[in-house]
């Protein structure tokens, strides 16, 4: 059969088209190799252009060419089919082998015959956890998570104390050395001692880092195994000992004096809430909130001295595997790590509690680095190919060298995502890359940071994130150049752009109601906060309240 098919493939036929121009009879002959791989419309256009054919034959030529290709192709298919049947009849082809080949191909390409994929451990655990957190056992789960949280907090407290003692001891040693500088000691002695101090700090930090990593890994394994066992036991109605295990009271939470010293106190927040309508014909309703708060307040676990420990995680846990996820936007630099700034603070908060569902923040960042490296490599190779095929100049060479030098960095406006189950009110963190340009007062709606917000909102629509927290001024901390006019201009720009993006969302997700939280730094004044609050109803169409009065 294969020989017969090769016989009919790559056969050349001549297409003949006759037409009249005035009193002249002309003939167009074009050799075509079958099967024709090119689109008939494209081939027709090339013939018109190549032979300078008159426009009045364009339609007729296209019909004739299309008909010729279809007829000749069908003839080839018929001859191929007849030759295949003859091969089967003559015994040249094994009928049973042919039938088994067809059956295998059909089974591999048909869904009803496809083998079901075996669920992974993560999928099984997610289903089990979702069932338990929506059952009376939810309090038991949160109690266990809290006990693990206290254990890690104690460990971190011990680490901080030991590091503090080491730094104090090293500070005293350095002071003594500085007093002897120029007398019995030289600059080389000071540098040598500083290097020893740095190495000692690194060794101690690595020791505690490994211990924390090991402890969280053990906790995660114990927790997941316990959740699976609890789910299996709950299915057994004869297990009477389980009812006592589930009835764990909040008073049984373990407290520690050292951990209390590391409590995150809730600072006084300013907050305004609005209900808005967007769209003229297809109206969608959304909730907007303006808050004066630290972005990391939505991540930190909070405690209440009077009533013991109070974790604000019940709603977060209930919606972990739902279609109502919560996210926030962190403004970061172009390096994918957790070594400085808000990235370090965020990583510290993530380490406060073991993540029982997703990889550690460090592991997720390593994956992001590999993805960015692959993407940059692909872009660089394509850019190099385009430069090699076109005209090269100095500017393009500089651009290529710059891309090669920063291939592990993200660009302004790009963002990467991390997933979390161990934060207070957040499931997803968008790490949006911005540069110092956002601190200037002349950014526009086409600025990379603004376009990054648009792409983030689009991801929210496509991945069931219904609550998103955004830094309104595109900064996490205030500085001297951020005057009142600067704040008003920046807030107006972000409000208007987000409004436009939310109107786009109606076409992306069908108009699902969402909550957008605009956060301003805590150092902003109350007067400035209320000016921003008064600006919001002027940009968004706020729902008016209806007052009902009874008639006597």
UniProtKB/Swiss-Prot annotation:
GO biological process, one term: regulation of mast cell degranulation
InterPro entries registered for this protein in UniProt: Fy-3
Location within or outside the cell: Cytoplasm; Early endosome
GO cellular component: cytoplasm; early endosome; protein-containing complex
One Pfam family this sequence matches: Fy-3
Residue numbers spanned by region Disordered: 383-403
Highest taxon listed in the record's lineage: Eukaryota
Entry keywords, A to Z: Cytoplasm, Endosome
Principal subcellular localization: cytoplasm
Subunit structure comment from the entry: Component of the FERRY complex composed of five subunits, TBCK, PPP1R21, FERRY3, CRYZL1 and GATD1 with a ratio of 1:2:1:2:4, respectively.
Function: Component of the FERRY complex (Five-subunit Endosomal Rab5 and RNA/ribosome intermediary). The FERRY complex directly interacts with mRNAs and RAB5A, and functions as a RAB5A effector involved in the localization and the distribution of specific mRNAs most likely by mediating their endosomal transport. The complex recruits mRNAs and ribosomes to early endosomes through direct mRNA-interaction. Plays a role in mast cell degranulation.
Name of the protein this chain belongs to: FERRY endosomal RAB5 effector complex subunit 3
Species of origin: Pongo abelii
Gene: FERRY3
């Amino acid at each position: 059969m294969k020989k017969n098919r090769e016989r009919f493939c790559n056969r050349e036929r001549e297409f003949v088209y006759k037409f009249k121009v005035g009193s002249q009879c002309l003939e167009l002959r074009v050799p075509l190799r079958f099967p024709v791989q090119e689109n008939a419309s494209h081939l027709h256009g090339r013939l018109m252009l190549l032979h300078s054919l008159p426009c009045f034959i364009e339609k007729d030529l296209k019909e004739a060419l299309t008909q010729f290709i279809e007829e000749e192709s069908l003839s080839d298919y018929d001859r191929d089919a007849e030759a295949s049947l003859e091969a089967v009849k003559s015994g040249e082809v094994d009928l049973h082998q042919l039938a088994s080949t067809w059956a295998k191909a059909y089974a591999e390409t048909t869904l009803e015959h496809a083998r079901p994929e075996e669920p992974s451990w993560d999928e099984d655990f997610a289903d089990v956890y979702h069932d338990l957190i929506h059952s009376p056992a939810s309090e038991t789960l949160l109690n266990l998570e809290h006990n693990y949280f206290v254990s890690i907090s104690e460990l971190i407290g011990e680490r901080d104390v030991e590091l503090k003692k080491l730094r104090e001891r090293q500070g005293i040693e350095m002071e003594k050395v500085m007093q002897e500088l120029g007398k019995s000691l030289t600059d080389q002695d000071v540098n040598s001692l500083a290097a020893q101090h740095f190495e000692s700090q690194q060794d101690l930090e690595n020791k505690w880092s490994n211990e924390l990593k090991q402890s969280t890994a053990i906790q995660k394994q114990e927790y997941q195994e316990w959740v699976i066992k609890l789910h299996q036991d709950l299915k057994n109605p004869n297990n009477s000992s389980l009812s006592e295990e589930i009835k764990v009271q909040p008073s049984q939470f373990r407290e520690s004096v050292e951990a209390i010293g590391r409590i995150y106190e809730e600072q006084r927040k300013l907050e305004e809430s609005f209900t808005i309508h967007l769209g003229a014909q297809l109206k969608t309703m959304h909730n907007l909130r303006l808050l004066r708060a630290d972005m990391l307040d939505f991540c930190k676990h909070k405690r209440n001295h009077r009533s013991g420990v109070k974790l604000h995680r019940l709603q977060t846990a209930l919606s972990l595997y739902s279609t109502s996820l919560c996210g926030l936007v962190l403004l970061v630099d172009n390096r994918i790590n957790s070594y400085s700034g808000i990235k370090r603070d965020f990583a510290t908060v993530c380490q406060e509690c073991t993540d029982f569902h997703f990889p550690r923040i460090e592991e997720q960042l390593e994956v992001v680095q590999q993805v960015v490296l692959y993407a940059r490599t692909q872009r660089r190779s394509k850019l190099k190919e385009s430069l090699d095929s076109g005209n090269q100049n100095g500017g393009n060479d500089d651009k290529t060298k710059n891309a090669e030098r920063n291939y592990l960095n993200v660009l302004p406006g790009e963002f990467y995502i991390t997933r979390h189950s161990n934060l207070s009110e957040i499931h997803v963190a968008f790490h949006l890359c911005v540069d110092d340009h956002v601190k200037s007062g002349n950014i526009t709606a086409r600025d990379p940071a603004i376009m990054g917000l648009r792409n983030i909102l689009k991801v929210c629509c496509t991945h069931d994130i219904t609550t998103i927290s955004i830094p309104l001024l595109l900064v996490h901390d205030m500085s001297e150049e951020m005057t009142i006019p600067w704040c008003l201009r920046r807030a107006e720009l972000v409000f208007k752009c987000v409004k436009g993006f939310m109107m786009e969302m109606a076409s992306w997700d069908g108009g699902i109601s969402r909550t957008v939280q605009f956060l301003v730094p805590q150092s902003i004044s109350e007067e400035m906060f209320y000016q921003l609050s008064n600006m919001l109803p002027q940009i968004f169409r706020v729902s008016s309240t209806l007052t009902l009065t009874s008639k006597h």
